[in-house]
Amino acid sequence: MEQGRPRSSLSLASSASTVSSLSSLSTKKPTRAVHKVHAFGKRNNALRRDPNLPVHIRGWLHKQDSSGLRLWKRRWFVLSGHCLFYYKDSREESVLGSVLLPSYSVRPDGPGAPRGRRFTFTAEHPGMRTYVLAADTLEDLRGWLRALGRASRAEGEDCGLPRSPARPRPGEGPGGPGGPPEVNRREEGRISESPEVARLSRGLGRHETHTPNSTVDLQTDTWSRRTRSPELFSPLSRPPSPLSLPRPRSAPARRPPLSAGDISFPARPHTPLSRIDVRPPLDWGPQRQTLSRPPIPRRGPSSEAGGERPPRSPQPRTPEQRTQSTQATSGSSTYLQLPPRPPGTQASMILLPGPPVDSALHQSLETDTLLTKLCGQDRLLRQLQEDLDKRQEEKEQLEAALELTRQQLGQATREAAASGKAWGRQRLLQDRLVNVRAALCHLAQERERVWDTYSGLEQDLGTLRETLEYLLHLGSPQDRACAQQHLWMVEDTLAGLGGPQKQPPHTDPKSPSPAPQGEESSERESLSESLELSSPQSPEVDWSRPSGGDRALSSPQSGVGSPRVSRASSPECRQPSSPLLRTKVDHL
């Protein structure tokens, strides 16, 4: 009696999401029971993969066994349509198993889950088997969670509505010959809804381009029609993007059965109900080009059997028309039910530059910073100039001491012991002179570098003063008061510095290598020792001296006994006393 009943389109559509992928195998072997439909299919019992469906994501995952030692096995997983297949390797030759994802809950495991691996997630269904998978990296985990979550949520929402376009062909599906009796018993409970649902099915079937074989084909065909217009498409049929984890969303409420008076056809017939077109993310452009070509549209058997007019192909429309039609059919409340988009894909949420900073505060900070740098460079220039003066005085003292040593060597050629000490003293003075000249070279280069920086700061300060003077004459009253205050600040700073610095003379001392600054104290000690050895009070100096030698050593004109040698007196000290002494020094 059950076999003679007319098959209801609602009963066929309710089971099409689970068994329609086995339509090609229904003539060879009986279909499994309804309560086994969502079970994990292995090897020969796995679902047949449709090569025309696009692949949303594929890659390596680790699957945990459901029994035994619960070992982890590495498998190649492919998400095609709304079905998850896995293979032994990436060649995808033979399917090891398949999982149909409608109504599955995909969630990541917490940090305290005793899984033994990182980046694990779980796919579970109430009253059915739970699958535990693990990714290699965090990016892979995000991509898989987003893809599987979208697939399961998209199918779960469509399950609450009548799937009249997904009507099985005659002789196929669970309602045909050899189908399970439980499906037929469910048809008896829904037979009262058949007229309304059939009328709705005929109305929606007029606008469909073709009738897919299964709910997976229906979802993919709808998605392929959306991809023809790159401006707008559905967020539920969008391919996954591994940018962020899927956001949780509450389960859709089951709607009451539609009546004949409530049936209204939307402005866009081929758009599924409760689905809103939104703008695609920026990162999905290159990924969409890699998808396979959608199947060629064909006329479904429903339109041929009913004798209705041929389907119309969707006409291209502008984004404004799409938005207006969507708002007219769905209402403003539908937009409130949409989940928030991930942060990485919010094309409309662009950070705009904030309001400009207060000009007075910015100008005050700029003036203060410029004056601070100028004072620092001025202090550094003065310190370098002092160091240069000290080194120059020390160099002149060493040159004067060397000149006296040469005179003493020319007079003490007869005594070998005294001559050896004089030669050692002369060598020490020469080394100190080389180090002082090297330090002079280093200080001169540093002064030139600091002077270049100081000149640049002076130019910036001049430009700033011109700007302040311009604001003082032509600015607003508030700007005038601020400019006057900054001008006073600049004038006070320049007055404290003593006016602009003068450019130092260019010095190019010849030096073999720069000397470190730490040797200054040792050089001064060596110089004092050498000067004490060359003084007349030293008991070691016993060679003969020319007449007036004591006066030459003690007189302030010689520059050796005085603590400070002037630059004017140094040329006189460097000249030998007579041409005969100069000849003897050259001979030595």
Swiss-Prot record:
This is Pleckstrin homology domain-containing family A member 4. Residues 246-260, 321-334 have a biased composition (Low complexity). It comes from the Eukaryota. Residues 54-153 form the PH domain. It is found in: Cytoplasm; Membrane. PANTHER family: PHOSPHOINOSITOL 3-PHOSPHATE-BINDING PROTEIN, PLECKSTRIN HOMOLOGY DOMAIN-CONTAINING FAMILY A MEMBER 4. The modification Phosphoserine is found at residues 164, 562.
